């Protein structure tokens, strides 16, 4: 999770005017020249990170994240929930700007509720992934990289969605600064017959691997299990509870 400090002059802020950066209020307004200087000076950049994981199984999906928020070299929070329910049978992990992620989650919740009210049924995961990609592509949430997971009439789904709205359905996926460590665990242990309980253990191992090597990840794990029965999110401070 992070707060934005990079140059926004080539994105939506350019269309609104240089004096009104889209995400400025979260950290204070920066003049254009100051943003340029911060970008040019490596020491001026705020390094941030997280680790999020999504795993598909035959009976549902498992999504897991660490619980640390960082800002530069500082741990800004030790108890952050980075996975949220956005659909009666769907959840979203978040990596990126805090404000943009919160706004994206609120928008998705509102859209899925409106869809259900108008049509009398839940939005499919394919439609929800398209909606999420379109919102990111619009530019308003372009510093967020989520994982979307859920269950619908077609089965279980995990979608990797990049910051520009590109959407790919995967068997498993990871995001964040610790992703290279987590991905190695999933590559080694995943198989098509994995159960929900096995996926929970696998996700915990993946997050733990990232926490041991990535300074921006840590402080426990949030695990979301999504099945036909709904979304269940549980916090664990100790990895041993899952291993």
Curated annotation (Swiss-Prot):
One GO biological process term: proteasomal protein catabolic process
Main location group: cytoplasm
Compositional bias segments (type: Basic and acidic residues): 29-38
Reaction catalysed by this enzyme: Cleavage of peptide bonds with very broad specificity
GO cellular component, one term: cytoplasm
Localization per record: Cytoplasm
UniProt cross-references to PROSITE patterns, sorted A to Z: PROTEASOME_BETA_2
Pfam families tied to this protein: Proteasome
Record text on subunit structure and interactions: The 20S proteasome core is composed of 14 alpha and 14 beta subunits that assemble into four stacked heptameric rings, resulting in a barrel-shaped structure. The two inner rings, each composed of seven catalytic beta subunits, are sandwiched by two outer rings, each composed of seven alpha subunits. The catalytic chamber with the active sites is on the inside of the barrel. Has a gated structure, the ends of the cylinder being occluded by the N-termini of the alpha-subunits. Is capped at one or both ends by the proteasome regulatory ATPase, PAN.
Protein name per the record: Proteasome subunit beta
Organism: Halorubrum lacusprofundi (strain ATCC 49239 / DSM 5036 / JCM 8891 / ACAM 34)
Biological classification of the source: Archaea, Methanobacteriati, Methanobacteriota, Stenosarchaea group, Halobacteria
